[in-house]
Each structure stands twice: as structure tokens, then as C-alpha cells.
Amino acid sequence: MDQCVTVERELEKVLHKFSGYGQLCERGLEELIDYTGGLKHEILQSHGQDAELSGTLSLVLTQCCKRIKDTVQKLASDHKDIHSSVSRVGKAIDKNFDSDISSVGIDGCWQADSQRLLNEVMVEHFFRQGMLDVAEELCQESGLSVDPSQKEPFVELNRILEALKVRVLRPALEWAVSNREMLIAQNSSLEFKLHRLYFISLLMGGTTNQREALQYAKNFQPFALNHQKDIQVLMGSLVYLRQGIENSPYVHLLDANQWADICDIFTRDACALLGLSVESPLSVSFSAGCVALPALINIKAVIEQRQCTGVWNQKDELPIEVDLGKKCWYHSIFACPILRQQTTDNNPPMKLVCGHIISRDALNKMFNGSKLKCPYCPMEQSPGDAKQIFF
């Protein structure tokens, strides 16, 4: 983090100089244009277009040329100073960041199978972002064959999202109505919130839309049980149509943030319906890598400095715990209290009859004959009674 602050400080200096240089350049050139324009007008008025210049005017023109030359040289000198500031940013980046991160990479990630998976993840990310042309180009260059059925849902979702961003609700409403049963099954309130926003957009039209708003309120009927209070608030706002909702106690209904919220809700519920995560795997992996990389580089340097390279053998475990934040928590992790090892698919957590949990490897090492004594309580039990648990 300190490295980022250092580079950012240098960058702010450059941006400040750019701003000052731009203002200085603009002011200097405007003064020159006004000066030369006034001089030209004075010469034409005094001597005409074809008359010879007097000695005084020749001297004035010489001074004008010198002023122009001095201004240009001053601007060029200031521009060179900016170049040196820009180069300092590059030096700060080189000094504070490690340009070679291959030491913490895994060679296996560049094998054919891993490369194919990476390309698939990138294609899916571009589909999610609506960058269909880029995704198709990547498929052609990498030799991937993508079923059109994989692309179609993303095309539709991006079309609806683009409409929501410009406050057009009709495509999203049509999608929500057509998927109503599945949305209800996952306890989604998307359809109601879309109807609510449409009703609010009618309220913004004032008394002109009063009859249409009352007619549209019939769409709230299926949601009366779960959203009774919200519907009551919406109907109460009709009383203030004449004076304007913005001048009423219901002004909170016009909050612009709810349009950003509806985009997030639609993305979340639509992805859940398609069995997808809200964020693309590529963006999640990239964010996690940005957090973990500095810590991994530091621990790698310490390991090499202390000549204990065997501590990190580049397998599926790290020599230290890297905290990625709660945003990257997807499943619970169990560490066996006996062997002090994290459980895996091959060594899963096992629940004993007494309720205590240990790893399968610990279970196999602890039982004697047909009996197993729990390491935390005096209960004896059969190893076969232990059950695998899933978090």
C-alpha cells in the first residue's frame, strides 16, 4: 500500500504540472495572438498594405518576433520539465514495484489444458460485459468452439441492462414476467421493484398521468402479501400529485440511487437464474491476485534471503495465510486441530459420534483396533461411526 501511495504522490505532481502548463500555454498564446493582431491592425491603418515600413515600425516588428521566440522557448523549456517529472513517475514505479513476478507463478498454468480453461474464462467474461465481437475474435484465435446457446443468455441480459441504465424498464419487465415462477422460487423481489419504479416514473408526470398510474397500480395485486407497506406508500403518494411528489413527504421515492440498485438486483437475480456467479470468475481471480501478489512477492524474497526455499514447494498450499477480505469468502475451511492441517477432498473433515470434528487422516492414525477414543472427551466409539461433513 505504501508503494501505491508513493507512486500516486509522484503522479499527482505530474498532473498538477500538466494543469499549470496548460493554463500558462493558453494564456501566453492568447496574449501573443492579441499582440500580433493589434500590431497588424495598427500597421494597416497607418501605412496601408503596400507602403514601406518606417524604421520605427521595423524595430517594433523585430521586438514582436523576439517576443514570439522568447514565448516559444519558455513553453518548450517548461515542456521539458514536465518530461523529467513523467520520467520520475516511471522510476518510482520501477523502484516500488517488482517487474518480474514469475518467481511466484506456477509453471503448470501455461500448459495446454490450463491455457484452454483460461481462454474459456476470458470468453465468458467478455460475454458478460457485452463485448461479443472481442469474445468471438478470441475464440477464433485460440481455437475455442463456443455453443451459441452459451452466448444467447448474455446477449439478452446485456440488452436489458443497457436499457435499465437509460431508465427504460419495459425489456426488464417483460423478462421478469416471463421468468416469474423461477424468480418466486428463489424468493426474488425483482418484478415488484420493476413495477414500483415504473409506477414512480408515472408519478413524475404529475396529474397528467394520474389515471394511467391508478390503472397501472393493478400490477401490484400479486405482491400485496409480501409488499403491503411499500404498496401503501406508493398509493399514498397519489394524494400529492397536484403539488408534485418532489414537494411532498414522498420525495424519497425519486431517489436516483434506486436505478443503480435495480441494475444490481437484476444482475444478481438473472445470474442466479442461469446458475452463474454475480461477478465473472476472471474479475474475481484478478482482484484476488492484486491483493495476494504483494504478500507473495514479499514472502518469496524472505524465503530466498534466509535460504529456506524448501518451505514453499509451489504446490496447492502457501507458506502463509493471505487475507483476501470477506468479499472473496465463498466456502468455509476446516483445519484439523490434531494434525494442524487444512482438510482437502482427499482428507475431508469427519464428525465423531460425540460431535467433535477431526480430519480423516487423524481418524486413521488414532484408532486402535476397533475402538477410537475422542481426543477431546472420554467417549469411546467405533471409527466406522464417524461421518464426513460438508461445509
From Swiss-Prot:
Zinc-finger ranges (RING-Gid-type): 336-377
A single GO cellular-component term on record: ubiquitin ligase complex
Top-level division of the source organism's lineage: Eukaryota
InterPro entries in alphabetical order: CRA_dom, CTLH/CRA, CTLH_C, Fyv10_fam, LisH, RMD5A_dRING, ZF_RING_GID, Znf-RING_euk
All residue ranges annotated as the CTLH domain in the record: 153-210
GO molecular-function terms, A-Z: ubiquitin protein ligase activity; ubiquitin-protein transferase activity; zinc ion binding
Keyword line: Acetylation, Cytoplasm, Metal-binding, Nucleus, Transferase, Ubl conjugation pathway, Zinc, Zinc-finger
E.C. no: 2.3.2.27
Record's catalysed reaction(s): S-ubiquitinyl-[E2 ubiquitin-conjugating enzyme]-L-cysteine + [acceptor protein]-L-lysine = [E2 ubiquitin-conjugating enzyme]-L-cysteine + N(6)-ubiquitinyl-[acceptor protein]-L-lysine
Chain positions found as N-acetylmethionine: M1
Enzyme class: transferase
Cited function: Core component of the CTLH E3 ubiquitin-protein ligase complex that selectively accepts ubiquitin from UBE2H and mediates ubiquitination and subsequent proteasomal degradation of the transcription factor HBP1. MAEA and RMND5A are both required for catalytic activity of the CTLH E3 ubiquitin-protein ligase complex. Catalytic activity of the complex is required for normal cell proliferation. The CTLH E3 ubiquitin-protein ligase complex is not required for the degradation of enzymes involved in gluconeogenesis, such as FBP1.
Protein's name in the database: E3 ubiquitin-protein transferase RMND5A
Organism: Homo sapiens
Gene transcribed to yield this protein: RMND5A
